[in-house]
A protein has these predicted regions:
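Bacterial N-terminal signal peptides that target proteins for export
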Residues: 1-14
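A ligand-binding cleft/hinge motif common to bilobed small-molecule-binding domains
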Residues: 89, 105-114, 163-166, 183, ...
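Flexible hinge/capping segments at coil-to-helix
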Residues: 133-151
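Short helix-initiation/N-cap motifs at beta->coil->alpha
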Residues: 66, 82-92, 139, 174-188, ...
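Ligand-binding cleft/hinge of the Venus flytrap
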Residues: 54-56, 69-78, 141-142, 146, ...
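Periplasmic-binding protein-like
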Residues: 124-131, 198, 202-245, 262
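Extracytoplasmic small-molecule ligand-binding "clamshell" domains
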Residues: 27-105, 114
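Ligand-binding clefts/hinges and TM-proximal coupling segments of bilobed small-molecule sensing domains
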Residues: 27-31, 159-173, 213-216, 244-262
Length: 262
């Protein structure tokens, strides 16, 4: 009995020692947080084609997430360096270490979450159609849109394309490479409809007379946006989440948002 008790106690002690060692290793494991500060720069991947979040303008970028990226870099005490990417390359660029964070209206999805971390969501969004105003009454639901005569246009490689292919089985789908001029194709009568994030279609409705967002406050699909982070780096994610929390609590986030949306 005494021997059995000693074995049990030894097992418990070994387990506690292993847990303590694991905790220490987790606490001392190198983090991108340290690398960024040593480097003196935060490398931010962004597509530059998604107004009002990120838009490439004459060699620089502007938008909600561009200003927030600068805020994050300032909180880290480093310079913000932007790296242009494409929607189809986001996960590859994050996995290769090309960037420390990806920002620019990126939807949080379970498929993406399998490969990367995301910050806490910073915006609730969802997919909504945008059409010529004369056609607004025709395209109220997925069923209204999914007809053989409907021409749906979509940018490649992101959640817009995934939504379109998952939900429209009869409509004609055209993949158009330029997410900046894609809305002009609808105005020109070369396509009937595009489905994008509700905030984007609201902005485009204001920017392009003749286009109307369809029920943007009642989107076809619920969605959230977050900042894409390297998988496994809990220390860096904790810093980004706390920075985001403070940006919202202090009103900095709202001020930047209103600058581009209101």
């Amino acid at each position: 009995m005494a021997i059995a008790s000693m074995i049990r106690r030894a097992g418990i002690a070994a387990g506690l020692a292993f847990a303590a060692t694991t905790t220490v290793l987790a606490q001392t494991a190198p983090s991108l947080l340290d690398t960024i500060q040593s480097r003196g720069a935060l490398q931010i991947c962004t597509t530059g084609d998604y107004k009002p979040f990120t838009l490439a303008m004459d060699g620089s970028f502007e938008g909600i997430d561009i200003e927030l990226a600068k805020s994050l870099a300032k909180a880290l005490g480093v310079e913000a360096k932007f790296v242009q990417t494409k929607w189809a390359d986001l996960l590859t660029d994050m996995g290769s270490g090309k960037c420390d964070v990806a920002m620019g209206g990126i939807s949080v999805t379970l498929d993406r979450q399998k490969k990367v971390f995301f910050s806490s969501p910073y915006l609730v969004n969802g997919k909504a159609p945008i059409v010529r105003c004369a056609d607004k009454a025709k395209f109220q639901t997925v069923a209204d849109i999914d007809k053989p005569e409907t021409r749906v246009i979509v940018n490649p490689g992101g959640t817009n394309e995934r939504f379109v292919r998952a939900n429209f089985k009869q409509a004609k789908i055209e993949v158009y490479p330029d997410n900046v001029t894609i809305f002009d194709q609808i105005l020109a009568g070369k396509a009937d409809i595009m489905v994008a994030e509700s905030i984007e279609v609201k902005v485009q409705e204001k920017a392009k007379p003749g286009l109307c967002a369809v029920n943007p406050d009642e989107p076809l699909q619920y969605g959230e946006m977050g900042y894409m982070l390297p998988r496994g780096d809990a220390t860096f994610k904790a810093f980004v989440d706390q920075w985001l929390h403070l940006a919202k609590a202090t009103g900095e986030f709202a001020k930047i948002y209103d600058q581009f949306v209101r």
